[in-house]
Amino acid sequence: MGIAVEARKVYPYPFQHVVTSYLNKYPTPLEKHVLSVKTVEEKTDPATGVVYRKRIATCNNVIPSFLRRCSILKVSNVYLEEESWLDMKTRVMTLETHCLTWAQYATMKEESVYKECTENSNWTEFTQKGTITITGAGFLNRVLETFAQTFLSHGVKKSISIMETILRERCGCPFS
């Protein structure tokens, strides 16, 4: 069946500030569940100037303990892989993220875009679409999808709030 979560936010800060803040966002005391983010690959396309990055995030397992009775869910950490393409010429950064930990049981995809806002070049537009489909947990599939939808919806709001806080701390009052 699967679930989907979507978000949109306009940050009243220039693209460069938002992208730099995003790439340096974690770890932060504002989000205790993200333990680390490690860049495992980075290269620049000499023809286009597009910077490609692959990063691995290590996060606490936040699945409730009553669901962790299922052996496949009994892990301390969850690993996410994020790939990003930063094009400073067009002022667009595209990201694709998926879960490595439960890849054989679930498909978790998140696609995000940061781009210069068409309304105001000093602003940055953020859009995100995420989907989760759980197939390998039998009767728990729907229960886990419902939990995932609630968790992801909350997580998107929290992530946006963290970005707003970091941008205010690093860049001061937003541009209008």
Swiss-Prot record:
Q: Which GO terms describe its cellular component?
A: mitochondrial intermembrane space
Which part of the chain is the PRELI/MSF1 domain?
A: 1-175
Q: PROSITE patterns of this UniProt entry?
A: PRELI_MSF1 (PS50904)
The residues forming the signal peptide are none
| Pfam families xref list | PRELI
Q: Which domain of life is it from?
A: Eukaryota
- Which ranges of the sequence are coiled-coil? none
InterPro entries referenced in this protein's UniProt entry, alphabetically: PRELI/MSF1_dom, Slowmo/Ups
**Protein name, UniProt field:** PRELI domain-containing protein 2
Q: Which organism is it from?
A: Xenopus tropicalis (Western clawed frog)
Q: Quick one: which gene encodes this? A: prelid2
